[in-house]
Amino acid sequence: MADRRNLFFFYGDDKAKLVEKMKPIYRILEENGFTILDHPKNANAIVSVGDDATFLQAVRKTGFREDCLYAGISTKDEISFYCDFHIDHVDIALQEITKNEIEVRKYPTIEVDVDGSTSFHCLNEFSLRSSIIKTFVVDVHVDNLYFETFRGDGLVVSTPTGSTAYNKSLRGAVVDPLIPCFQVSELASLNNNTYRTLGSPFILNHERTLTLKLRPDGNDYPVIGMDNEALSIKQVEKAVVRLSDKQIKTVKLKNNSFWEKVQRTFL
């Protein structure tokens, strides 16, 4: 981090108020040899100011850059999964940086291809949900194997870091980010003699390919979720999901591991 001194700050809500609060921090950073940029193009460190949702937006809006470090500053009551620093204690963060008390961790992403025409990455999860009050039908394939036919409200495919988010609310497993994999969870599946699914989340390793083929039954206009954004596509035939080679490098304090965050948040 000490060698990455071109900083771009990404703000969520209340930008004007937060920029004003960050001005003393800007001065401290500049006094310590950092340069504050107005555009992310020439930045080698991108800092989100807000919450985890702001961090996800910062990564997406700056193109999932692999040549940058990402860091999160929380403006909420406490630090969170993607925010290792708090806006009221950035001076402590600077001390940690100068003492080399921070580490760089890499978070995996998933790559999604929709009908061979639209592709994107997700840091947390990709979701495919019915856009109307009606179930839809999806044929699920793992690699070249037809695996199951799902009928229900939707499917969620999460990364290990995303396993603590939407996935966890669906009773999915919390997965260590050091394991290269992705997880598939169901939203209100209908199981009967015609449609039968595994009925539980399942985890695929980094070499697997997941293909979701929608049945053209009049409900093939789903809502596609990319982390905390929705993608507008009129009609979908299939979505292909893989674990991407692209990883996001983030800054972490040495005493703030993924499992310490899980413990602090849920236990």
Swiss-Prot record:
Cofactor(s) annotated in UniProt: a divalent metal cation
InterPro entries associated with the record: ATP-NAD_kinase_N (IPR017438), ATP-NAD_kinase_PpnK-typ_C (IPR017437), NAD/diacylglycerol_kinase_sf (IPR016064), NADK (IPR002504)
Annotated organism of origin: Bacillus cereus (strain ATCC 10987 / NRS 248)
Family: Belongs to the NAD kinase family.
Binding-site residues for NAD(+), renumbered to this chain: 52-53, 124-125, 151, 153, 164-169, 188
Active site (record annotation): 52 (proton acceptor)
Function, as annotated: Involved in the regulation of the intracellular balance of NAD and NADP, and is a key enzyme in the biosynthesis of NADP. Catalyzes specifically the phosphorylation on 2'-hydroxyl of the adenosine moiety of NAD to yield NADP.
Predominant localisation class: cytoplasm
Subcellular location as annotated: Cytoplasm
Molecular function in Gene Ontology: ATP binding; metal ion binding; NAD binding; NAD+ kinase activity
Biological process annotations from GO: NAD metabolic process; NADP biosynthetic process
A Pfam family matched in the record: NAD_kinase_C
Documented EC number(s): 2.7.1.23
Protein name: NAD kinase 2
Superkingdom, natural source: Bacteria
